[in-house]
Structure formats: C-alpha cells, structure tokens
Design a protein with these regions (language model features):
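Short, histidine-centered active-site or binding-site loop motifs used for metal coordination
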Residues: 25-28, 151-154, 225
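Short, basic/glycine-rich phosphate-binding loops at helix/coil junctions
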Residues: 22-23, 84-89, 140-148, 222
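Internal, conserved structured core segments that host functional sites
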Residues: 106-160
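Beta-strand elements within well-structured catalytic alpha/beta cores of enzymes
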Residues: 20-24, 58-63, 150, 171-184, ...
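A short aromatic-anchored loop/beta-hairpin motif
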Residues: 2-116, 120
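Solvent-exposed alpha-helices and their adjacent loops that cap or buttress functional pockets
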Residues: 13-15, 51-52, 139-143, 170
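Surface-exposed, charge/polar-rich loops and edge strands
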Residues: 108-111, 115, 145-146, 156, ...
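Catalytic-core regions built around general acid/base machinery
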Residues: 45-48, 167-171
Length: 278
C-alpha cells in the first residue's frame, strides 16, 4: 500500500482567486466510517482550501451514482442524505450530511452549459447520494457549504463528460469548488471476493493514469480502454472512471495534479485523490 500527499492548494500566483478542482475516489460506502489515510488527507486539504479561498460559496460535484438520460443538475434547496446502498452496518445509515442545496448555482451551471451548446435540465427533488456525501464528509465535514450535484449521463463517453466539466471552468473564479467523485479502480467482483493484498493491476493502472494526467496526454486518456494496462479489469464498467474527465475538463489546459492520496483499500480499490490547479 502506498500513500503520499501533497497538500499545496495553489502553486501559481496567477490563479490565486481560482479554486482548484478535486478528483476523489469514494471507494466503498464504508469510507464514511473507515477513513484510512485518504480521509484525513482530504480533511486537511479541505481546511487549507477554506483558509486560502474565503470566497468559497458552493460545491458542484459529479457522482456516478446518479445516472440519467441527458444532462441534469440538482436544484433541490434541501437535498438531504440518501443512503442508497444495502447490507452495511447500522452506523452507516445513521450518518447525515445536511449541507444545503444551491438552486441559484444550479441555474448558473445550466446557463454555462447552454452557452456551450449543451442541453440540460434541473431536478428539484434529487437528494445527495453516497458518491457525493461520503467524500464531502471528509473534505468539508461541517456540511455548511451549499452543494449542487451533477448527474453522469447514461452512455456518455469520456469526451462528452470532459466537455461538461470544461464548460464550468469559469465557476472556479467565482467561489465554486468543482469535485468529481468516482473511483480510480472499481472491480466489485474482486472487492466482494475479500482480497486483502494489493493487486498488482490496481497499482499499474493507477500509476498509468497518473502519468497521463501529469503529462497532459488527453488523447491517450480518452482512449483509456485500449491504451491503459488492465483497463477492463480495473473497470469492468466505466461509470466510476468517467468522472475523472469531468475534473480534467474543469481543470483545463495546463492544470497540474497535486496528489493527496495513492492509498489502496481492501486490496482492489485505488483511493487516488488529487487536486488540479492552474
């Protein structure tokens, strides 16, 4: 298991008022209770963000646990906490993340997508699923920053998800933290198989992604299913990997990744988390 952290939130003075973008692997729902090394690293980073960016006014987060036809954004003013899973310890169902929603920010998201030629709608009833609230419990544990969740469109490819994030880049200069919640590896069959030793393919796939992200090799990343080692074993389905492209799109050209975690949990779940700054 390897875990390293770089907690710099900004390395470029020109971006002093531009919030970073966060990609976070949310792992199992148990990440809310079993934080490992990744949870504290996210909490420390979140504290630094709040100190350095007092203008923080909201979060826009994509989760693969909200998949819909088309493009949607949550406009629920009080989304609440949805325990959208089964078979876990009772303590997990007692957790709440009571962050308010932000309908006005949802409208800003819709406007930016419209300007980019992306048709989208709002959902005023949507609650926060665990792909959103579990990582946010670590990043912003006070639950006092309004949250707007973005759906992952069914059948979207990497380029389309990238475009969704790219259209929202300007929000970073307007006090908005953009978060993409997914998983660097997500093979549930192996996860439920109870492996404890870190599988070699998990490390090889994760480090390949890191190399491409750091080099800005977007075309190679778009072609990940053919280019990455062990791609289909790391992701038998692609929904937990695609939020990465939302982060990369929102990060934009020249963004550098500052890794917060390279931890592997349960032998198969790479908990990679990094902030993009430019």
């Amino acid at each position: 298991m390897e875990n390293t952290a770089s907690l710099n939130v900004s390395s470029h003075p020109a971006g002093a008022h531009r919030l970073p973008v966060l990609f976070v692997s949310h792992g199992s729902p148990m990440f809310a209770l079993e934080a490992g090394a990744t949870g504290p690293a996210l909490t420390q980073w979140g504290k630094k963000v709040r100190a350095q960016y007092p203008q923080l006014r909201g979060v826009v987060i994509m989760s693969p646990h909200w998949m819909v036809q088309g493009v949607q954004v949550m406009s629920n003013p009080q989304p609440g906490t949805w325990h959208d899973f089964g078979g876990f310890p009772r303590a997990l169902y007692q957790l709440e993340y009571p962050a308010p929603g932000f309908p006005a920010l949802a409208n800003e998201v819709l406007d930016l997508w419209q300007q980019a030629g992306i048709a989208a709608t709002a959902d005023a009833q949507r609650p926060l699923d665990h792909g959103a609230w579990v990582p946010l419990m670590h990043v912003l544990p006070q639950a006092d920053v309004p949250v707007v969740q973005v759906a992952l469109p069914v059948h979207a490819d990497a380029r389309e998800v990238y475009a969704l994030g790219r259209a929202l880049q300007s929000l970073r200069e307007q006090g908005v933290l953009i978060v993409a919640s997914g998983s660097m590896t997500h093979n549930l069959r192996e996860f439920f198989g109870g492996a404890q030793q870190t599988a070699d393919y998990v490390v090889e796939f994760s480090r390949w992604v890191e190399m491409q992200v750091q080099a800005g090799e977007m075309e190679t990343l778009f072609d990940w299913q053919l280019s990455a080692p062990h791609a289909l074993r790391a992701h038998p389905s692609d929904e937990h990997f695609l939020p990465l492209y939302f982060a990369l799109g929102a990060g934009g050209d020249g963004a550098k990744a500052h890794y917060l975690s390279r931890e592997v949990m349960y032998g198969t779940l790479a908990m990679d988390a990094f902030a993009l700054q430019n």
